[in-house]
């Protein structure tokens, strides 16, 4: 690998989806970072980086705050892609319309595309305009249910590697359907057909990571059959995802509340896949019911 090789991350996505937290996270990881970089200036900036011995891990926030963003972004990406000394990935941050509206109300800011002041109209227009960019992004992170701390951890897990070569990582996560589907999931599996530990009083307040809950969930005949088929489905297709250049494959397993069944299954799957692949395990909603009770 040449000393002049640059590892570039373009951070973009919906307004209000967390790009400020993201770029701060990259700075913490040792990246050279710039927020609100006009697309037309990116190629020239990268030329300057190539001519110096400065940090060659670079993260740039490029978004619609630049007035010419939608006119310039495609030609900018083409220019970057044609440079053999640059490895670049796109991180697209997203969130549901409802969550973005809530964040705008909280900050009392107006949406830059909401000409008549209606935030939701601006969000919908922005989502439509950004759809092509989202489809070409190697990393799509749904921040709807993420705290800033969780977003920072997600970015650290995906971008802290020292190598300039994009890696293939499997994100195995559990979630509760009652709290919404994870928008960044590539594969979603439903385990609500399994017996629910919630109705066992001694297991209700525990999670699928507790041994007695885990054993309860995984010992049922239906669990054994489904888990076998799950592995037989997922394992053979992993090399194909890797071959297509996908950096992160997110496998989401859901139950009603995301506390028992999905947690046990996700944990079991993560351990199985980790023997041959780089795997990160997370449980989005396992403590959500407890937090709700504590707030009441």
UniProtKB/Swiss-Prot annotation:
Coiled coil: none annotated. GO terms for molecular function: ATP binding; GTP binding. It holds the Pfam family RapZ-like_N. ATP binds at residues 13-20. Keywords: ATP-binding, GTP-binding, Nucleotide-binding. It comes from the Bacteria. GTP binds at residues 63-66. InterPro entries: P-loop_NTPase, RapZ-like, RapZ-like_N, RapZ_C. Belongs to the RapZ-like family. HAMAP family: RapZ_like (MF_00636). Displays ATPase and GTPase activities. This is Nucleotide-binding protein MGAS2096_Spy0550. It comes from Streptococcus pyogenes serotype M12 (strain MGAS2096).
């Amino acid at each position: 690998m040449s000393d002049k090789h640059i590892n570039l991350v373009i951070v973009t996505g919906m307004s209000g989806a967390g790009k400020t937290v993201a770029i701060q996270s990259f700075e913490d990881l040792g990246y050279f970072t710039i927020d609100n970089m006009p697309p037309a200036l990116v190629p020239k900036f990268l030329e300057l980086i190539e001519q110096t011995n400065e940090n060659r891990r670079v993260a740039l926030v490029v978004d619609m705050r630049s007035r010419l963003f939608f006119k310039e972004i495609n030609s900018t990406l083409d220019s970057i892609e044609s440079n053999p000394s640059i490895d670049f990935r796109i991180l697209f941050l997203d969130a549901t319309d409802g969550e973005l509206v809530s964040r705008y109300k909280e900050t009392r800011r107006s949406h830059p595309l909401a000409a008549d002041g209606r935030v939701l109209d601006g969000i919908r227009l922005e989502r439509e305009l950004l759809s092509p960019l989202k489809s070409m992004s190697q990393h799509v992170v749904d921040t709807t249910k993420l705290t800033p701390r969780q977003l920072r951890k997600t970015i650290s897990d995906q971008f802290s590697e020292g190598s300039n070569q994009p890696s293939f990582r499997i994100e195995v996560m559990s979630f509760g359907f009652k709290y919404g589907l994870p928008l960044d999931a590539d594969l979603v599996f439903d385990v609500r057909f399994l017996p629910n530990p919630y109705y066992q009083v001694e297991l209700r307040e525990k999670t699928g990571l507790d041994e007695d809950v885990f054993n309860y969930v995984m010992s049922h005949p239906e669990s054994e059959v489904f888990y076998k088929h799950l592995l037989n489905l997922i394992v053979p297709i992993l090399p194909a995802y890797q071959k297509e250049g996908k950096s992160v494959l997110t496998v989401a397993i859901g139950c009603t509340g995301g506390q028992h069944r999905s947690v046990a299954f996700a944990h079991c799957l993560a351990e199985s896949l980790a023997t041959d692949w780089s795997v990160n395990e997370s449980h989005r909603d396992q403590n959500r019911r407890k937090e709700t009770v504590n707030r009441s």
